[in-house]
Amino acid sequence: MGRETILFSSEEKKDLQDVAEFLHQLADKLAENNVIFRRGTEELVVEIPNNVVLEIKVEEELKRDKTQQSLEIEIEWIVGETDSGGVELG
C-alpha cells in the first residue's frame, strides 16, 4: 500500500446554495483541466488529465442519538499516465 500525502484540505459549514455554486465553479475548472485551490496565502495548482476515475458514495453513520449522512465525490487519476486509447482492431 502506498503512502498518502494530503496536499490541501478544507472543511467548513456552508449553506447548500453556496455549496452548489462552488461545485458549478469547480465543474467549469475541471472542464479546463486546471483547478487552483486558494486559502489565504496558500495555493495549490492541480493539473487534471482528461481520463479520470469518478467515485461517488452516499454513507450513513449511526452516532449515539443521531444519524449522520454524507455524500462524497472523489476524482482520481494516475500522475503521468496517458490515455491508451482503448483496444483497436488491426
PLM regions with names:
Residues L26-L30, R38-L44:
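Extracellular/virion structural assembly segments
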Residues N33:
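Short beta-strand/loop motifs in extracellular/secreted proteins, especially
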Residues G2-I6, L44-E55, E59-G90:
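Long protein-protein interaction modules used by eukaryotic assembly/scaffold proteins
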Residues M1-D28:
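Terminal, regulation- and interaction-focused segments at domain boundaries
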